[in-house]
Amino acid sequence: MNVDAEASMAVISLLFLAVMYVVHHPLMVSDRMDLDTLARSRQLEKRMSEEMRLLEMEFEERKRAAEQRQKAENFWTGDTSSDQLVLGKKDMGWPFQADGQEGPLGWMLGNLWNTGLFCLFLVFELLRQNMQHEPAFDSSSEEEEEEVRVVPVTSYNWLTDFPSQEALDSFYKHYVQNAIRDLPCTCEFVESFVDDLIEACRVLSRQEAHPQLEDCLGIGAAFEKWGTLHETQKFDILVPIVPPQGTMFVLEMRDPALGRRCGCVLVESECVCKREKLLGDVLCLVHHHRDPSAVLGKCSSSIKAALCTGFHLDVCKTVQWFRNMMGNAWALVAHKYDFKLSLPPSTTSCKLRLDYRSGRFLSIHLVLGVQREDTLVYLVSQAPDQEQLTSVDWPESFVACEHLFLKLVGRFAPENTCHLKCLQIILSLRQHQSLPHGASRPILTSYHFKTALMHLLLRLPLTDWAHNMLSQRLQDILWFLGRGLQQRSLHHFLIGNNFLPLTIPIPKTFRNAEPVNLFQHLVLNPKAHSQAVEEFQNLLTQVKTLPHAPLAAAP
């Protein structure tokens, strides 16, 4: 009877845990597991292990208590022939047994109240699971006079008719691959051409106390190899600048809590002896001068007069100086090339337009940057479209860090991965997407989709991005961004990301900082959130109809 009682209680415990597992982890029709399901399953495994451990401890405690009672009764009755507890005897009582009943059946009949509560708990859990499977975008606002009606988008209903692997491959080859066939060679030419201009600028500014130009760095979609047809004619180049001898740049960062990540570049005088070690007993003529500040002032007076507002480097003045340098440099190297170069006006970047005789043209945007310490974080001259900054504010840019991250992924990932193809397919569809009625510009940008991709590249093994997983990974990116829209939350990839590889050189304060929400403006502006949801829904419609209809140009 002892063995039967223990076996019965073990069976009941296992049945209880099995029911709990089915309730908390229902099997879906699809064989794919999203990130939330994976996290819930791991939490459930831990909870089940903890519950099993508690049940075993409770059983052992009850068993010891029963043994103590048996010994005490044997002592008072004089029966000391055996000190072992025989479970299941009516006079001794089974720990999980009601009076007058024997075995597990008696326990069930004697604890109808607990059984009823357990059934109510099961019903509640089933209802809760059904409610959780129907998330919807809430884009209504009490402040708006006219309520905006948005069709809910769940995380399951639109995945059922998602395009197949073959349909996505066909679309990619027809609309993306053919358009970017010559993109790698064009990127290589653009970088070499800009380097040629920069070398000519160095020759022209050798005798001037102006900022020095470093080697350029190709950034953006074209150079990160996720460019589409729209990016094949537009190229972004970062040109770092450093102070001339006798001058130093001091970066004064503004408080990020104010909502803007930017800083000012303070121009100060600096003696060369602080940078270079003087040999032997050579004396510094500046610091041994009666008035060192007067000598140092002459070294930085020209740059302050030409490029500064007050004591800070002015974005517009610096870009205009750089634009003039590019024009003079072109005069030195024009004989090498067979196209016409023009410089369209711009206040935050130096734009170059290359017109060929065939009618083809290339647009190059040269963005100036001041490096922050020994990292790949720069203060750049070009601000995002939605930000309004003063002429001495230089926005903070992580584009070089992101460029390095994607480069490392391409180096260590298996051959022919699909992570860039996913982004190219999404952006190719968005380029042919009409804006919602009354909208002047889109809310969702290519940077939002790129951020979602980079987050998933850290969460999923690189082997999960094989070519035959294109359809699944494309669904993951759309699901990730859709959930972010629903929650009005999309964290910046680099700021506050503890999972970022240490090979990405960013300041330690950024790793330990609070995450930055790229969708914060959607929290403050319900109308913008409604537009973003509509844009996302239109994109889903385009993806689902991908195999059946050709692309049409947006008006």
UniProtKB/Swiss-Prot annotation:
Any single Gene Ontology cellular-component annotation: membrane
Compartments (UniProt record): Cell membrane
Mode of membrane association: Single-pass type I membrane protein
Signal peptide residue numbers: 1-24
Swiss-Prot/TrEMBL GO biological process terms: calcium ion import; negative regulation of T cell receptor signaling pathway; T cell differentiation
InterPro entries for the chain: ITPRIP-like, Mab-21_HhH/H2TH-like, MAB21L/cGLR
Extracellular-side segments: 25-103
Keyword set, alphabetical order: Cell membrane, Coiled coil, Membrane, Signal, Transmembrane, Transmembrane helix
Transmembrane parts of this sequence: 104-124
Chief localization: membrane
GO MF terms held by the record: receptor ligand activity
Residue ranges, Cytoplasmic side: 125-555
Source taxon at top rank: Eukaryota
Protein task: Functions as a ligand of CD3E, inhibiting TCR-CD3 complex signaling to regulate T cell activation. Induces stable CD3E-NCK1 binding, thereby preventing the CD3E-ZAP70 interaction and subsequently inhibiting the activation of the downstream ERK-NFkB signaling cascade and calcium influx.
Family as reported in the entry's similarity comment: Belongs to the ITPRIP family.
Protein name (record): Inositol 1,4,5-trisphosphate receptor-interacting protein-like 1
Organism per entry: Homo sapiens
